[in-house]
């Protein structure tokens, strides 16, 4: 879940 959020932020 956190990984997906990180990608979205980028």
Swiss-Prot record:
Q: What is its EC number?
A: 6.1.1.6
**GO cellular component annotations of the record:** cytoplasm
Which leading EC class covers this enzyme?
A: ligase
**Catalytic reaction list:** tRNA(Lys) + L-lysine + ATP = L-lysyl-tRNA(Lys) + AMP + diphosphate
Q: Which domain of life is it from?
A: Bacteria
User: Which residue ranges run through the membrane?
Assistant: none
Q: What are the UniProt keywords, alphabetically?
A: Aminoacyl-tRNA synthetase, ATP-binding, Cytoplasm, Ligase, Magnesium, Metal-binding, Nucleotide-binding, Protein biosynthesis
Q: Where in the cell is it found?
A: Cytoplasm
Q: Name one GO biological process term.
A: translation
Q: Which cofactor does it need?
A: Mg(2+)
In its keyword annotation, does this UniProt entry include Disulfide bond? no
Q: Does the keyword Magnesium apply?
A: yes
Give the quaternary structure.
Answer: Homodimer.
Name of the protein? Lysine--tRNA ligase
């Amino acid at each position: 879940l956190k990984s997906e959020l990180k990608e979205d932020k980028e």
